[in-house]
């Protein structure tokens, strides 16, 4: 997951400040918080910890996602790969574009959890958002093709290795010549607070406070320098469709932590990609613990974030 940049020059030079811009007509949607709650409860409450050390639970999570997508009317593709004696799978669905079907907008979230944690916020919230965004997309054909992918094995010990699900996916996409115009990684999205001091920062924290709020009430968009045009378009589109607070940062890939999720796999293959997050360990006190349980998630705030993401996705996919 995410760590904010520790290089002050990176923050000063590349933090992105944007104002809303007009978009073409979009019918606003309201995601029911209870729909998101049901997904998080199923994954983190009923299935619980899900990783290669609990293989049955990890497969149950994959089956849950596949059933949800089939119910929405999609054909589900499993991208399987071997890891030791077992086989694991990324799951993919596609809403083919009308005018520019070879141009792809990809939305992804990992469905495994870290060892010892039921993974409600990290990352059942990301999967819940993924499932609700795909449900909306099923009824709205766009100019570009939109893919939704549930990635396996994002967490350690597979993180940033050749066995990481998104690494396998991105590498094969590049080998096929896929024209992925934007990749959006939905990562740890469900914890928000209006309390002063609820948002913390890495050293030197005093400088970060010059640019970012000390209340953890916002969603953060993160990009590398090469993805700045995508970041600008995404944040402007989000703000045009939602009044939920959003902050953004574009910085160097060498800054520790900036590539700590599935978007990093796409940067490695030269694709433009963003992470959308609540900032995880810099706000969420239960990050990577056994206390990361469904009741910790702010479902009302999460629903507002997904509302904004739905409008943003529509704008990117035109």
Report residues per predicted region:
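Second-shell loop/turn segments in exported
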Residues: 24-31, 45-56, 77-82, 113-123, ...
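Proline/glycine-enriched tight loop/beta-turn segments at coil->beta junctions
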Residues: 98-104
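Active-site-proximal beta-strand/loop segments in catalytic clefts of secreted hydrolases
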Residues: 43, 79-81, 95-97, 108-112, ...
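Active-site-adjacent substrate-binding region
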Residues: 182, 189, 193-318
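A non-catalytic alpha/beta surface segment that caps or lines the substrate-entry region
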Residues: 38-98, 247-249
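Extracytoplasmic/secreted proteins, especially bacterial periplasmic and envelope-associated proteins
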Residues: 35-38, 42, 56, 60-71, ...
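Acidic/histidine-rich catalytic neighborhood of metal-dependent amide-processing enzymes
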Residues: 114-232, 258
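N-terminal capping segment at the start of a domain
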Residues: 14-60, 72, 112, 282-292
């Amino acid at each position: 997951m995410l760590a904010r940049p520790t290089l002050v020059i990176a923050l000063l030079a590349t933090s992105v400040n944007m104002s809303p811009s007009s978009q073409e007509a979009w019918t606003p949607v309201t995601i029911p918080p209870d729909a998101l709650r049901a997904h998080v409860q199923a994954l983190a409450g009923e299935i619980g910890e899900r990783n290669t050390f609990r293989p049955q639970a990890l497969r149950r999570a994959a089956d849950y996602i596949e059933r949800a997508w089939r119910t929405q009317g999609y054909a589900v593709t499993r991208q399987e790969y071997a890891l030791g004696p077992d086989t694991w799978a990324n799951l993919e669905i596609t809403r083919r574009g009308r005018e520019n079907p070879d141009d792809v907008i990809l939305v992804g979230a990992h469905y495994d959890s870290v060892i010892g944690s039921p993974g409600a916020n990290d990352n059942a919230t990301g999967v819940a958002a993924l499932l609700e965004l795909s449900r909306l997309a099923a009824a709205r054909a766009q100019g570009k093709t939109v893919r939704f992918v549930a990635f396996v094995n994002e967490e350690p010990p597979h993180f940033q290795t050749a066995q990481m699900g998104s690494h396998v996916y991105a590498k094969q996409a590049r080998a096929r010549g896929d024209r992925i115009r934007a990749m959006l990684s939905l990562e740890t999205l469900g914890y928000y607070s209006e309390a002063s001091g609820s948002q913390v920062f890495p050293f030197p924290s005093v400088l970060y406070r010059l640019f970012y709020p000390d209340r953890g009430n916002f969603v953060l968009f993160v990009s590398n320098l090469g993805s700045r045009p995508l970041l600008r378009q995404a944040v402007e589109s989000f703000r045009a469709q939602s009044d939920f607070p959003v902050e953004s940062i574009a910085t160097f890939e060498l800054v520790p932590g900036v590539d700590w999720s599935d978007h990093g796999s796409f940067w490695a293959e030269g694709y433009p990609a963003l992470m959308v997050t609540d900032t995880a360990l810099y706000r969420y006190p239960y990050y990577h613990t056994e206390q990361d349980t469904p009741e910790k998630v702010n479902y009302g705030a999460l629903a507002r974030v997904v509302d904004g993401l739905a409008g943003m996705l529509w704008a990117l996919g035109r």
